[in-house]
Swiss-Prot record:
PANTHER family xref list: F-BOX ONLY PROTEIN 3 (PTHR14289), POLYMERASE DELTA-INTERACTING PROTEIN 2 (PTHR14289:SF16)
Biological process (GO), any one: error-free translesion synthesis
Name listed for the protein in its UniProt record: Protein ApaG
Alphabetical list of PROSITE patterns matching this protein: APAG
Length: 127
């Protein structure tokens, strides 16, 4: 069995604009994102840390590194999923996020699980 089949984590992200917490007049745009992390490999793996690359509409890039997610380092058995919600604040009405989770398999192997890029956008801004 190849390493790509053994150590496989799929990440899905869905973002939404949080109008109630945003203030466009002050360039304060709040977005929530829902993440689903699914272990589609053949060994258990723990999410150890995260790395986000957040780019706003002007091209300004912010990188975020941290341990776990929402205060947890979930252990995912093969076939298991973990879901969480978090947020990001931008100074522009649009932006993108992508990154990776650093995982540690039950056999000690460490690997990165890529987080595909997703859009942060205030409704009716993009055509």
């Amino acid at each position: 069995m190849s390493k790509s089949e053994t150590y496989r984590i799929e990440v899905e992200a869905v973002a939404e604009y949080v109008e109630a917490q945003s203030n466009p007049e002050d360039d304060h745009y709040v977005f929530a994102y829902n993440i689903t992390i699914r272990n589609t490999g053949t060994v258990a793996a723990r999410l150890v840390s995260r790395h986000w690359v957040i780019t706003d509409g002007t091209g300004h890039v912010q990188e975020v590194h941290g341990q776990g997610v929402v205060g947890e380092q979930p252990l995912l058995a093969p076939g298991e999923s973990f879901r969480y919600t978090s947020g990001s604040v931008l100074e522009t009405a649009v932006g993108t996020m992508h990154g990776s989770y650093q995982m540690e398999a039950s056999d000690g192997h460490r690997f990165d699980a890529p987080i595909p890029a997703f859009m942060l956008a205030m409704p009716r801004v993009l055509h």
